[in-house]
């Protein structure tokens, strides 16, 4: 018989790039999880905006099991029916004419940046290689994407970094305009900065970026890894703004918990990519594609997307009520079910401590830096789960405040 697994085993065996919670989840259903001891948690973290339909959704399980009984993998020397169906669904639902599949958001962003460089090289010459990104952004952990993310803490120990990447201030079109010129090949931006604090872009900012890119023949890349697939109440957040990118990256919720990512592109952009210019062994595998296809079927409906907007109101109303009692937050912001509670000056830097109190109370939340408590629950979270989870969060806030004043 094998030895029981404990949380301490993580500290013994794993490369220490994470600091996971003190419990190990073993079972989930809907927006509830249970740990090894049987304690129940309401999940408002959603696997960092991944579990868009909660845990163990029956239709996702059915799609996975059905494909698993056929075949799992062939490699990119062959295509398969699930990936072609998935590609058509994404094309029909968005601006895109072509799709490249991969396994994560970082890979999707890596592909987008490589495509942008190649597009500019082929059309305009090697001088046009500049990339403009934004401070406090997050685009992934590859060397290219971590360099595009404007957070030195994630990149400072890995020099030399890829060159020709500059960072403007987010939501500041004048700052961006000062950096975007005829040597710029692409601008990459999140419609809502997730890891950077749940900061929505303004309409004027995204529209201004579109105009600047058009003026300087640069590609506009929307990183919708966290905001995509219904998270904001539209299939993709850019649909709130009426701004169409040249490239869009998507992952996280696309697989509902199964690893998958995709780069969406116009025909013109995709035309510079030829056999061998990019690839991945597992991208577009039939298991991931079957699940993602079902995810899109379930999420891309008026009922589901309108339900996200309704659930946003449930959360914001109750979070404001909690804040009225405990005066923790200066602002509750976000779109749909990507919500950030910004700590006021009295509690600055203590988001992690609040998230730890929440776990003790039986509710899982995220942070976005030291000053923002982040919520990214399942898009189909029930009213009862919202009520129960926020009751527990209120208890955590009460304990946090009373502990600090004792």
From Swiss-Prot:
Reactions catalysed according to its record: N(2)-succinyl-L-ornithine + 2-oxoglutarate = N-succinyl-L-glutamate 5-semialdehyde + L-glutamate
Pfam families documented for this protein: Aminotran_3
Annotated metabolic or biological route of this protein: Amino-acid degradation; L-arginine degradation via AST pathway; L-glutamate and succinate from L-arginine: step 3/5
Database matches in InterPro entries: Ac/SucOrn_transaminase_bac (IPR017652), AcOrn/SuccOrn_fam (IPR004636), Aminotrans_3 (IPR005814), Aminotrans_3_PPA_site (IPR049704), Class-III_PLP-dep_AT (IPR050103), PyrdxlP-dep_Trfase (IPR015424), PyrdxlP-dep_Trfase_major (IPR015421), PyrdxlP-dep_Trfase_small (IPR015422)
Physiological role: Catalyzes the transamination of N(2)-succinylornithine and alpha-ketoglutarate into N(2)-succinylglutamate semialdehyde and glutamate. Can also act as an acetylornithine aminotransferase.
Protein name, as recorded: Succinylornithine transaminase
Gene3D superfamilies referenced in this protein's UniProt entry, alphabetically: Aspartate Aminotransferase, domain 1, Type I PLP-dependent aspartate aminotransferase-like (Major domain)
Sites bearing N6-(pyridoxal phosphate)lysine, chain numbering: 252
Highest classification ranks of the organism: Bacteria, Pseudomonadati, Pseudomonadota, Gammaproteobacteria, Enterobacterales
Keyword Secreted: no
């Amino acid at each position: 018989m094998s030895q029981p697994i404990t949380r301490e085993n993580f500290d013994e065996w794993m490369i220490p790039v994470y600091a996971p919670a003190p419990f190990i989840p073993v079972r989930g259903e809907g927006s509830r999880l249970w740990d090894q001891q049987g304690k129940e948690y309401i999940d408002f973290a959603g696997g960092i905006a991944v579990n868009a339909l909660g845990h163990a959704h029956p239709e996702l399980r059915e799609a996975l099991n059905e494909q698993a009984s056929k075949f799992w993998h062939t490699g990119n020397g062959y295509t398969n029916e699930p990936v072609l169906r998935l590609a058509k669904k994404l094309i029909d639902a968005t601006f895109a004419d072509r799709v490249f599949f991969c396994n994560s958001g970082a890979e999707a962003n890596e592909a987008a940046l490589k495509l942008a460089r190649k597009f500019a090289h082929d059309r305009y010459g090697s001088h046009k290689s500049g990339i403009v990104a934004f401070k406090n952004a997050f685009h992934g952990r590859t060397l290219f994407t971590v360099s595009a993310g404007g957070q030195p803490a994630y990149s400072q120990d890995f020099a030399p970094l890829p060159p020709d990447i500059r960072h403007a201030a987010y939501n500041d079109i004048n700052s961006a305009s000062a950096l975007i010129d005829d040597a710029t090949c692409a601008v990459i931006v999140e419609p809502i900065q997730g890891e950077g604090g749940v900061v929505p872009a303004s309409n004027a900012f995204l529209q201004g970026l579109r105009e600047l890119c058009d003026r300087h023949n640069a590609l506009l890349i929307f990183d919708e890894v966290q905001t995509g697939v219904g998270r904001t109440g539209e299939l993709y957040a850019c649909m709130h703004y009426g701004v169409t990118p040249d490239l869009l990256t998507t992952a996280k919720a696309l697989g509902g918990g199964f690893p998958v990512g995709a780069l969406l592109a116009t025909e013109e952009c995709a035309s510079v990519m030829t056999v061998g210019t990019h690839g991945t062994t597992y991208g577009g595998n039939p298991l991931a594609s079957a699940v993602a296809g079902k995810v899109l079927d379930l999420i891309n409906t008026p009922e589901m997307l309108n339900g996200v907007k309704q659930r946003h109101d449930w959360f914001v109303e109750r979070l404001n009520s909690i804040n009225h009692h405990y005066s923790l937050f200066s602002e509750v912001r976000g779109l749909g079910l990507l919500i950030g509670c910004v700590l006021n000056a009295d509690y600055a830097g203590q988001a992690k401590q609040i998230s730890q109190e929440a776990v003790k109370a039986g509710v899982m939340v995220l942070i976005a830096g030291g000053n923002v408590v982040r919520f990214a629950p399942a898009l189909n979270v029930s009213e009862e789960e919202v009520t129960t989870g926020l009751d527990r969060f209120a208890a955590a806030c009460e304990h946090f405040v009373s502990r600090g004043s004792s």
